[in-house]
Design a protein with these regions (language model features):
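Conserved catalytic/switch belt of AAA+ P-loop NTPases
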Residues: 1-45, 67
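AAA+ P-loop NTPase catalytic core
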Residues: 1-3, 81, 95-283
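The conserved Walker
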Residues: 8, 60, 270-271
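Intrinsically disordered, low-complexity regions enriched in proline, serine, glycine
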Residues: 12-13, 28-29, 53-56, 72-75, ...
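A short helix-turn-beta junction within AAA+ P-loop NTPase domains corresponding to the substrate/partner-engaging
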Residues: 21-25, 52-81, 86, 283
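Core residues of folded domains in eukaryotic genome-function proteins
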Residues: 22-24, 30-32, 38-42, 48, ...
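E2/UBC-UEV (E2-variant) core
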Residues: 38, 67-111
Length: 283
């Protein structure tokens, strides 16, 4: 199989028309002819056929998959196939329990920082579940040995707490501060005993899952004490970095994402320390 998963280019696709014929001969621009074997097949995975000519379309069978039909479940199923069966069974039930109800709650009551047209929620849901998988991989990585096997067995309760922690920042990471309590309330209703015990004014965003105790802990416990730099006579105010709850949890999330070789995007207005947080993490 030759799989071409890029866009259909109007010029490049014309050279492949002869390959799609019964004779399967590729004619290059310099006049060379390459004969394809009878067992070779070509498959195209473009986003659309805007630049495809009728000659190309008539030579290929077309399978159209709507984004509204695909959803996030095939993505999750593909990832769970790479996990141990016992773990995959637990995670499958957690995806079924939380993802769709939380998406529904967010669509009804919340507004993300990066909004879009009403139909764009499909792609956004897909991206948020991708982020959820990335954070789960980052959290599970600390419980795996060098060969990817489990160092120790994890309880279903711990899996659920870990899932709630990852859901907080994957599905709720782009919410306005005023909308976070709405998502947190719905997560508490679904999580039950697996949710942290918190004050009425607090949300899931103030808590993380401690890997040693396997219990919820407040992010304030991770904020180091800041000491004034007495070794400098006149410290430069613009260069002083004082650890806060926000900076500590952003650094922890960056660590989880980069540990599985993924990228992160910080969203926020000017002057919210996005660049400073990344530079501090890279230092």
């Amino acid at each position: 199989w030759i799989t071409l998963d890029g866009p259909v280019d109007a010029i490049g696709i014309e050279t492949l028309n002869t390959v799609l014929d019964d004779n399967k001969v590729l004619t290059l621009a310099n006049g060379d002819r390459v004969q394809m074997s009878g067992t070779m097949k070509a498959m195209f995975e473009p986003e659309n056929l805007n630049n495809a000519s009728p000659a190309t379309v008539s030579r290929a069978g077309i399978i159209y998959v709507s984004e509204t039909e695909l959803g996030w479940r095939p993505l999750v199923a593909s990832w769970l196939d790479t996990r141990p069966k016992a773990e995959a069974a637990v995670l499958t039930s957690l995806f079924d329990k939380y993802v769709d109800p939380l998406f529904h709650a967010m669509k009804m009551t919340c507004k993300p920082v990066m909004g879009g047209a009403p139909w764009e929620h499909v792609s956004r849901d897909f991206c948020q579940v991708t982020t959820l998988i990335t954070l789960l991989r980052g959290c599970l990585r600390s419980h795996e040995d060098e060969k990817g096997g489990k160092k120790e067995s994890l309880s279903e309760t711990y899996y659920e707490k870990m899932f709630l922690y990852c859901v907080t920042w994957s599905l709720g990471g782009m919410l306005q501060a005023s909308d976070r309590p709405k998502l947190s309330k719905r997560m508490q209703e679904l999580g039950g005993a697996s949710a942290p015990t918190m004050a009425a004014s607090e949300t899931f965003f103030e808590y993380f899952l401690d890997e040693d105790s396997r219990e919820w802990a407040h992010w304030e416990s991770r904020v180091p004490e800041w000491l004034y730099p007495h070794d400098e006579e006149t410290p430069k105010f613009a260069q002083l970095i004082i650890p806060t709850l926000d900076s500590v949890r952003l650094e922890a999330l960056l660590g989880a994402v980069t540990s599985v070789d993924k990228q992160a995007l910080f969203v926020g207005g000017p002057g919210t320390a996005k660049t400073t947080a990344i530079k501090q993490f890279m230092a």
